Every structure is written in C-alpha cells, then in structure tokens.
A protein has these predicted regions:
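Acidic catalytic loop of the alpha/beta-hydrolase fold
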Residues: 256-261, 288-289
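Short beta-strand/loop motif that positions the catalytic acidic residue
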Residues: 245-247, 252-254, 258
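Alpha/beta-hydrolase active-site loop
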Residues: 103-113, 123, 136-158
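Short, surface-exposed "cap/lid" segments of acyl-processing enzymes
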Residues: 63-114, 118-120
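An N-terminal hydrophobic leader/cap segment in hydrolases
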Residues: 1-49, 56-59, 63
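Catalytic active-site module of serine/aspartate enzymes centered on a nucleophile-bearing elbow/loop
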Residues: 284, 294-312
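Short alpha-helix in the alpha/beta-hydrolase fold that links the catalytic acid
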Residues: 248, 262-271
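Hydrolase active-site cap/lid region
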Residues: 179-232, 292
Length: 312
C-alpha cells in the first residue's frame, strides 16, 4: 500500500511540475478585449518585424508632440491587459487571488493626455503577434528581439524618427528590455527613460509557487522539465545579470507582498542597475501581483512625473 501511495504521490508531483512548465512551453493566448477607442483615443493598427522577422502587431496612438512612449506587457497578457476576470484565462490565477482584469487602457489615456505619442505592441506568442521562438515563452531571453523591433520600427517612420523615446516595459516586457540592452546596447542609444512595473526572475516565480504547493525542493525538477520542453535554461531567465546593462533613468514598481514572487528578486534587479537616476516604488496593501499592473492605470502620477523629468 505504501508503494502505491508513493507512486501516486510521485505521479501527482510530476504532473504538477509538468503543469508549471506547460505555461511556458504552451502559453495560452488571451484575447484583446479593449481598444484605445474605448477611451476616445484615435489610433491605427500597425505591424512590424521583430529583430528576427517575427511579425509584431500593435497600436499607434498619435499626439501632437515630439515624444513617444513604447509600451509592451506582462507574460500571458497583451497590449490591452489581461482578462483574468473571465474563464478560462483567470483559472490559473484564482488560488493567488489574481483572477481579476488587468486593463492598460487608462495608461494610454494618461500618457496621451500628457502629450505623448504611444506605440503599444504584443510580444511574440501573445495577443495578435505571430508565434516565434518555437512558440515558447523565454521570459525575456527571446522577446528582446521584439523590443528591438519596436525601436527600429519607430526609427523607420519619418514622423517618429526624431522622437524623444521612453519605454513603458511591464514584467516580461522589462525582462526583454534588459536582455536587449545587454546584447545590443546600441539599439537603445536614444531611449531616455524607462518605467517598469514588476520585472521578475523565473526562478523566483517558480520557487515561490512551489513553496505554496508544498514542494519547495522541486525547483531542480522544474528546471530539468523546462530544459526538456523548451531547450532553455532556467538560470538564464534570472534578471539581475541583465539589469547590469540598464544605465538609463529607470523607475521600477513592485507589489511588496506579491504572493507570486519575493521582494528580494526585484530588489536585486534594482540594485544591479548602474543607472544614476533610478527609483523603486513599493506598492503596499495587497499581495495580488496583478494589482501592481493596475497601479499606474489608477495612479499615473509616478509614471507621468518620471517621463516628464527624463523624456520631456
């Protein structure tokens, strides 16, 4: 009987590990439920190639200025946000209380009202953008090609070529930005500032989740399963080494008691940045990570002030 119980427990453990890895190897694609028009903003649909040719889709929201904010999004989300309030998209996040909608439309409204042009796009494998990198998520180590593609696209448009640029890089989008700055710093030469809600190391995410699941010793199994499923190394998706390339004025934001990671991770990312002008804003009073994504839409002051200081 003990052998049967042990076999069942092993099967359950293996299934849980497989489920965690499948979120990266076979990412769900959530729908784009809103558009800038919902907030009265004129916009056009755009598409452009990533650095490796993957087709990236997005919105361009024009303004009468020489300033441009380029925005991307968290993992499993898209340029609109994330429909976590709807099944099946919120199911995986229910246990942590994150089965709520993330809505980035107010971000774009606040930025436009402050005089910024906006280019918002979907990372590969999300939203309307094409599949790339074998259809797997790289937590930034593949998606950096999309970030560079967005910068090259802005420079390719005559009316945007001389724009003062800021980046609104959220979660995986900030990871991708940091990886891009590490690999191709020359592509970021005219970026003046970054606002970055909640970058995250994948090992910190997995380690925290495994702790909640009562499997704190399973991280090596997850790393092995991830390697087998995606040909990527978990250690390569830890962000502090890439943060060492961030010498641009950067504002980080993070839910301090985030149930899906630890404050030590974002603190290590922040500490590794050599930027002379940098700040870390802790979001208090919640343990829901997705409240961190909704913070700037509801409290735009820090974002508008940061871009105002460094972009103009």
């Amino acid at each position: 009987m003990t052998q049967v119980s042990e076999a069942a427990a092993h099967s359950t453990r293996a299934a849980l590990v497989t489920g965690l890895v499948s979120m990266m190897a076979n990412p769900p694609r959530s729908p784009i439920l809103r558009s800038p028009a919902d907030d009265g903003l004129a916009y056009s649909d755009v598409f452009f190639p990533a650095m490796d040719g993957v087709t990236i889709e997005g919105w361009f929201i024009p303004a009468d200025s020489d300033r441009l904010i380029i925005a991307n999004h968290p993992i499993w989300a898209n340029r609109y946000g994330f429909p976590g309030h709807l099944e099946p998209y919120g199911n995986a996040w229910k246990a942590s209380g994150n089965d709520i909608e993330v809505n980035f439309m107010p971000d774009y409204k606040h930025l436009h009202d402050a005089g910024y042009n906006i280019l918002a796009y979907d990372l590969r494998n999300f939203g309307g953008s094409a599949a790339g990198s074998g259809g797997v998520i790289g937590n930034g180590i593949r998606e950096y090609r999309d970030v560079i593609g967005s910068l090259r696209y802005a420079r390719s448009r005559p009316e945007l070529r001389e724009m003062k640029i800021g980046l609104l890089s959220r979660c995986c989008g900030m990871n991708a930005t940091m990886v891009g700055m590490t690999k191709h710093p020359e592509e970021f030469r005219d970026v003046r500032a970054i606002v970055a809600p909640q970058p995250i190391s994948l090992s910190a995410f997995y380690r925290t989740i495994l702790g909640h699941m009562g499997m704190p010793d399973a991280l090596p199994e997850v790393a092995d399963a991830l390697r087998r499923a995606t040909s990527m190394e978990l250690k390569d998706m830890d962000m502090p080494p890439y943060a060492a390339a961030v010498d641009i004025p950067t504002l980080l934001l993070q839910v301090r008691n985030d149930a899906l990671t630890t404050p030590d991770d974002v603190q290590a990312i922040f500490d590794a940045m050599p930027a002379e002008q940098k700040e870390l804003l802790w979001i208090e009073g919640t343990n829901r990570r997705f409240d961190g994504y909704n913070h700037l839409p509801g409290n735009p002051g820090p974002m508008i002030d940061w871009f105002g200081r460094f972009v103009g």
